[in-house]
Structure formats: structure tokens, C-alpha cells
């Protein structure tokens, strides 16, 4: 179920403050955050936000298509190693 329109999007206050200060100073350094739950606002477009995935910070360059999504959607927490395959069939191909 999605969030009520009357409530508005959720963004952590400390992240908004960091984005506004980066905009004022024309700072291009990545903004480091642990807030995966924050919604991407139009103010974030063009900035690089380093989102923590539980192990490291993954740089996410915010584009226009990302507005309305959560930051955590672009910083995966699990590494996909691939599905198990038939090793006999894979080895016999030439």
C-alpha cells in the first residue's frame, strides 16, 4: 500500500539539510547517508548520494526518472551470484 497523498513524501531532515547546503555551495562531493527510507525529491536531481547498503556506501547519481522512488531501491543489499546451472551441459559446448 502506498503512502497517503495528504501526508506527503518522507525524507529525513538531516538529508534535506545536506542537500540544501550542497546546492548553496555548488558542492559536487557525494552526500553520504544511511537513510535508505527517504524518498527522492526533485531537489536531489543532479547530485550524487552515497547510500549505505549494510556494508559500504554505493554512489547513486540522481536523475529525473528516480523522483518519487526511495534511495534504498538503487543500493542493493544482496549480491546476486547467478543461478546454478548444469555444469555438464555448459562444459560440452564448443
UniProtKB/Swiss-Prot annotation:
Membrane-spanning regions, if any? none
Tell me the InterPro entries matching this sequence. Ribosomal_uS19 (IPR002222), Ribosomal_uS19_bac-type (IPR005732), Ribosomal_uS19_CS (IPR020934), Ribosomal_uS19_SF (IPR023575)
Q: Name one GO cellular component term.
A: small ribosomal subunit
From the record, what ranges are coiled-coil?
A: none
Known role: Protein S19 forms a complex with S13 that binds strongly to the 16S ribosomal RNA.
Q: Which HAMAP family match?
A: Ribosomal_uS19
The record's comment on protein family reads:
Belongs to the universal ribosomal protein uS19 family.
Q: Could you tell me which PANTHER family the record lists for this protein?
A: RIBOSOMAL PROTEIN S19P FAMILY MEMBER, SMALL RIBOSOMAL SUBUNIT PROTEIN US19M
The protein in question is named: Small ribosomal subunit protein uS19
* Species for this entry: Nitrosomonas europaea (strain ATCC 19718 / CIP 103999 / KCTC 2705 / NBRC 14298)
Amino acid at each position: 500500500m502506498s503512502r497517503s497523498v495528504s501526508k506527503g513524501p518522507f525524507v529525513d531532515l538531516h538529508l534535506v539539510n545536506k542537500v540544501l547546503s550542497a546546492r548553496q555551495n555548488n558542492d559536487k562531493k557525494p552526500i553520504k547517508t544511511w537513510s535508505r527510507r527517504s524518498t527522492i525529491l526533485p531537489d536531489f536531481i543532479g547530485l550524487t548520494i552515497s547510500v549505505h547498503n549494510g556494508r559500504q556506501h554505493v554512489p547513486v547519481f540522481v536523475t529525473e526518472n528516480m523522483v518519487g522512488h526511495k534511495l534504498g531501491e538503487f543500493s542493493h543489499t544482496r549480491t546476486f551470484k547467478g543461478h546454478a546451472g548444469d555444469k555438464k551441459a555448459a562444459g560440452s559446448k564448443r
